[in-house]
A protein has these predicted regions:
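A SIS-like phosphosugar-recognition module
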Residues: 1-223
Length: 223
């Protein structure tokens, strides 16, 4: 395989690879851009544009810019990122919950929990502040997750009945994200998937008593 015909380089303009004739082309990114932001740089731009076309990447950047603008809003009722951050601080430092589960009910987001895991745990995985002084509070939870309904048959047992309370973040869509919705017994597969989400949220919040202690779950689990 000839790199000059099949491979591109995405690197800093000061890198030895920047003007290397052994590659078909080079795309540049500033050397101060960290990995957690690379999806909106030349790294993400090259991959998304080649795979889906430049307009998709342009739309992606527009969405990122809109999210940035929303994150600057001082009104917490209009700033979901700020609301989520404050809830997370409360759950970790006041309630002392050790972890958070991200549960997308869409196979299209199968890797989204891992993405959030990297963003949150790399960004907050510190023991000193920017001045080098030791931090006297907990910086973040362990983030994990899996698409539903796979997780329901994997680790939801602990979420419902375990002795540790794990805050949950459910993600669901009214429409199928892959365009492959099917009708089964008078309702679509997406409707059934959404019903699973609602049932889990209600069960986690309300719990259920049973004569058999092994089947009892107390509820009062935040999601």
């Amino acid at each position: 395989l000839n790199p000059a015909k099949h491979m591109i380089a995405v690197t800093s303009e000061t890198s030895p690879l920047a003007h290397n004739p052994d590659y078909l082309a080079a795309f540049y990114m500033d050397d101060y851009i960290g990995g957690r932001y690379s999806s909106t740089s030349g790294v993400g731009g090259a991959v998304l544009s080649l795979a889906f076309g430049p307009q998709v990447f342009a739309d992606f950047l527009d969405g990122a810019a809109a999210a940035d603008a929303t994150a600057k809003n001082k009104d917490i009722r209009k700033n979901p990122a700020l609301m989520d951050a404050l809830i997370g601080i409360y759950e970790r430092n006041v309630q002392e919950y050790p972890s958070t589960a991200v549960l997308p009910y869409s196979q299209a987001l199968s890797r989204f929990p891992a993405h959030l895991q990297q963003l949150d745990m790399e960004s907050n995985g510190k023991q000193v502040n920017r001045d080098g002084n030791a931090i006297n509070y907990v910086t973040g939870p362990v983030i994990f997750g899996e698409p539903g309904t796979n997780g329901q048959h994997s680790f939801y047992q602990l979420l419902h009945q375990g002795t540790n309370i794990v805050p949950l973040q459910f993600i669901a869509f009214s429409k199928n994200q892959t365009g492959k919705d099917v009708v089964i017994e008078d309702s679509t597969s997406q409707v059934k998937l959404c019903a699973n989400v609602v049932a889990q949220i209600v069960a986690l919040a309300c719990g259920k008593k049973d004569a058999d202690p092994n089947k009892t779950f107390e509820g009062n689990r935040p999601s």
